[in-house]
Amino acid sequence: MCIRDSPDTQFTIIDGVVDAPNVQNVIFKEHEGSFLVGIMAAMASNSGTVGFVGGMDIPLISRFECGYKQGVAHADSSMSVLAQMTGSTPAAWGNPTKGGEITRSQVENGADVVYAAAGGTGMGVYQTAADMGVLAIGVDSNQNYIQPGTMLTSMYKKVGLAAYESFAAAVDGSWSGGFKVNGVAEDGVGAAMDEYNADLVSADMLAAVNTARAAIIAGDIVVHDYMSDNSCPL
């Protein structure tokens, strides 16, 4: 079904954009969620160096990277961040071997926490981190269960909630086209806490995340969005 051929049908696109009046585009402030897990990475690190493994080298993934770097610096401005994208083609999303190789290199260069925003490539990041005795951070959904005990947290996006809210709005008549942006203030992104990472998250770490979350909501912390100007302040 073509969206433009069905003007009386309401469509919701999650994590994508279609410019049409009968489409609601739901997108997320990944930079804000990445800021929160960056704080956790900095606080969990003993080496003073953390890592980031991106998937395809596109502005969206640079948004994750930039938010993460800002969170790390917010917690400890002396920290170093090693960052590398997996590739420049869609194959970068499904190369766990390459993800593992990048992770190994970062760990050998001092990183003891590695955040992956790389799709299926992240599975290689998580496995290598576990094998080398360092921590990893998952992405998009709660992936803490994948390597229990070595997954510090995951930067989740509440896609299910976004879908529910869109359907509920359609039912009650409040649905509208355009953009719906879910960030920290909308409880659309955050850092996952559960039984799988409970032993890794200190009270101080949790307090720091909650304080930063409140500051973002209040507007006291503004996390720069790489996609707003294709630049990162760090």
Question: What residue spans do the PLM features occupy?
Answer:
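A residue-level marker of the well-folded mature domains of exported/periplasmic proteins
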Residues: 4-234
